[in-house]
Amino acid sequence: MTIFSRIPKVDRILEQDEVRRLLADHPRPTVLAAVRTALDALRAEARAGSLREQDLADGAVAGRVGREVARSTACSLRRVVNGTGVVIHTNLGRSPLAERVRQRVDDTAYGYSNLEFDLERGERGSRYSHVEKLLCELTGAEAALVVNNNAAAVLLALSALAGGKEVIVSRGELVEIGGSFRIPDVMQQGGAVLREVGTTNRTHSRDYRQAVTSETGLLLKVHSSNFAVVGFTAEVTAPEMVAIGRELGLPVMADIGSGCLIDLSRFGIRGEPTVQEFVSVGVDVVTFSGDKLLGGPQAGIIVGRKAYVDPLKKHPLLRAIRIDKLTLAALEGTLRLYRDERQALAEVPTLRMLTASAEELRLRARQFMRRLRRGVPSSVRLASLDGVSQVGGGAYPLLELPTTLIAVDVDGVSPQEMEARLRRMTVPVVGRINRGRFLLDARTLLDDDAPAVISALRELAS
């Protein structure tokens, strides 16, 4: 009897107790499709010569069906364990929210809210009022506005302040970020006319002054957060641009990308200016993201002088890019943590990960490994290694953060197979392969990730 002939038929699988329980909880077509998928996998393994006798046991086959049902009924967008060591991982949703912020979002989502209702006056209010005062308090700006992402913030500002006019920007600041988002394209879409000055590596104050004409509407500075130009370089600083703008009667705008509200240099993380620095030197409009170094939800934040922010609130484009209530709840909750810097550093996950010391990471790795060892079979072996993490999110492209890595080895499973199978689990576990081993970075592992990793490794080793 060949191994193909021992693969069970559909009817026999449907009669198994575990599969009957699945039929009681799920539509029959869903379970039937899972059975056929499991059988296809068994036949493929038989053809490859990797199918084992124990894989054909009733419990093993039913387990496959159960996992396939779980996979097919799971939401497409779901929680993932980030073991990559990239803190602001764009593909994994960037910044996780603080626990109390998650609770605020849940409370707002549960029922109705005062999104656009003034509870004091009993009349229509503005959704932006929930965060404007907070943003002004935290940044020192006169006015603030929020939209759904920073690209939209830049587009809105350019459309409202420089539509049909020239915008002067250094050639070395014409950046492209992920998803082919390019500053020149956004300027064109906003109706602004790009006027490049300087060279890729050197731009001077005189370049801006010489480029100004009667058609000039705005001076733009773009922070090159996702790349670095080193060597023979020169750039015009924000204070210098403000001086030029005041001299020539032109507004100055800065797109600073990540938008950090806390100076992280004391933690060895240098090179990213704070929002407050740009506001304090007189930049008229500053735009930045909510889900990068700020550690909140995806949002585009605009702060600056009232004379230039208020026109944005009346622009027709704002309606198309306005922020929704759940994002607004998450953003307000995150911003409130920043009223106490110590609280923000302790509770905002992104900040907590970025500022973790080497000793904290070693301890975190030891504790995580201890929990894993209690839950996985002996065929799973764990070891700690020194390594480096990355900030991610287009910030600090040259910075490497020392970290502790957890190396995972499973008998009979190659690192490549492990990586592929772990990211297909009910709760996907995403790590990286380096030095011929599958690695999880302690910096980006959350405390409650352990049960999901244990479950995944147990299934992998079975």
Curated annotation (Swiss-Prot):
InterPro entries: PyrdxlP-dep_Trfase (IPR015424), PyrdxlP-dep_Trfase_major (IPR015421), SelA-like (IPR018319), SelA_trans (IPR004534), SelA_trans_N_dom (IPR025862). SUPFAM superfamilies: PLP-dependent transferases. The modification N6-(pyridoxal phosphate)lysine is found at K292. Pathway: Aminoacyl-tRNA biosynthesis; selenocysteinyl-tRNA(Sec) biosynthesis; selenocysteinyl-tRNA(Sec) from L-seryl-tRNA(Sec) (bacterial route): step 1/1. Its cofactor is pyridoxal 5'-phosphate. One of its GO terms (molecular function) is L-seryl-tRNA(Sec) selenium transferase activity. Keywords: Cytoplasm, Protein biosynthesis, Pyridoxal phosphate, Selenium, Transferase. GO terms for biological process: conversion of seryl-tRNAsec to selenocys-tRNAsec; selenocysteine incorporation. It is found in: Cytoplasm. GO terms for cellular component: cytoplasm. It catalyses: L-seryl-tRNA(Sec) + selenophosphate + H(+) = L-selenocysteinyl-tRNA(Sec) + phosphate. Its EC number is 2.9.1.1. Converts seryl-tRNA(Sec) to selenocysteinyl-tRNA(Sec) required for selenoprotein biosynthesis. Belongs to the SelA family. PANTHER family: L-SERYL-TRNA(SEC) SELENIUM TRANSFERASE (PTHR32328:SF0). This is L-seryl-tRNA(Sec) selenium transferase. The gene is selA.
